[in-house]
């Protein structure tokens, strides 16, 4: 087994790619958010290249808004050694419902991510952590880099320190790279249109079977046009998330 490849127990990733992307309206009027390009390739392509690097062979894309554009793109057989299944999971479905709609295609453990963020996270280590902890829901925790100046001040509101574009924020946030066990479906009411990130995850956390895998490397989401331009600039100057060879 190549050193970067994952354990054969887990080779499936679900990518949530059906949202409207309203904060990136300049681009998403014409295409779904996961098809917005970075370096002349859809961000969805970058995400799949990342998982391909770690040996994933089964990709399930939960499409919705303008999903036909995603299907058309992957009909070109860009990834010859990977099975890519693009499924229409509904225009207005929230994340938990999208997952419910592909449940029958899922193995006991699987990866889940969003179609709008890139990172240099080590998926092999993330998966190993998931199994080592006997977790049913593993979240990648990331420390987002601020693009704004950070201000520190005292009780009188006098500024004591100003840091331009601070590289550190105290709290981890969800990086959107998950490993899940199918036991999580016990916490999803399939009769409701739910956000996975709200009631289901809140209740799973109470079981003591949810863990955070801390990632200190690069991570960046693409929520706005500013984010897209930032990633375009990085692609030209510093390919921080490109861990694959070609």
Language-model features and meaning:
Residues 35, 151-153, 201, 212:
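A structural signal for short hydrophobic beta-strand segments in well-ordered beta-sheet cores
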Residues 2-15, 23, 37, 41-114, ...:
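Conserved N-terminal catalytic core of the sugar/cofactor nucleotidyltransferase
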């Amino acid at each position: 087994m190549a050193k970067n490849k994952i354990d054969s127990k887990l080779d499936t990733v679900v990518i949530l790619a059906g949202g409207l992307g309203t904060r990136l309206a300049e681009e998403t009027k014409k295409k779904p958010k996961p098809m917005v390009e970075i370096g002349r390739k859809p961000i969805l392509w970058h995400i799949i290249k990342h998982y391909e690097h770690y040996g994933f062979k089964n990709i399930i894309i939960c499409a919705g808004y303008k999903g036909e554009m995603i299907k058309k793109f992957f009909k070109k057989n860009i990834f010859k050694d990977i099975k890519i299944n693009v499924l229409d999971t509904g225009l207005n479905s929230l994340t938990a419902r999208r997952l419910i709609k592909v449940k029958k295609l899922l193995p006991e453990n699987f990866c889940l991510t969003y179609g709008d963020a890139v990172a240099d996270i080590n998926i092999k280590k993330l998966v190993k952590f998931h199994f080592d902890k006997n977790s049913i829901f593993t979240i990648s925790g990331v420390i987002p880099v601020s693009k704004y100046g950070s201000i520190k001040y005292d009780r009188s509101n006098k500024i004591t320190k100003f840091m331009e574009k601070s590289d550190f924020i105290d709290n981890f946030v969800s990086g959107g790279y998950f490993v899940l066990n199918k036991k999580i479906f016990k916490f999803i009411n399939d009769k409701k249109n739910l956000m996975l990130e709200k009631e289901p995850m809140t209740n799973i956390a109470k079981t003591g079977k949810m863990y955070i895998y801390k990632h200190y490397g690069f991570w960046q989401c693409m929520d706005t046009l500013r984010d897209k331009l930032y990633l375009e600039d990085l692609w030209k100057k510093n390919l921080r998330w490109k861990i694959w060879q070609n």
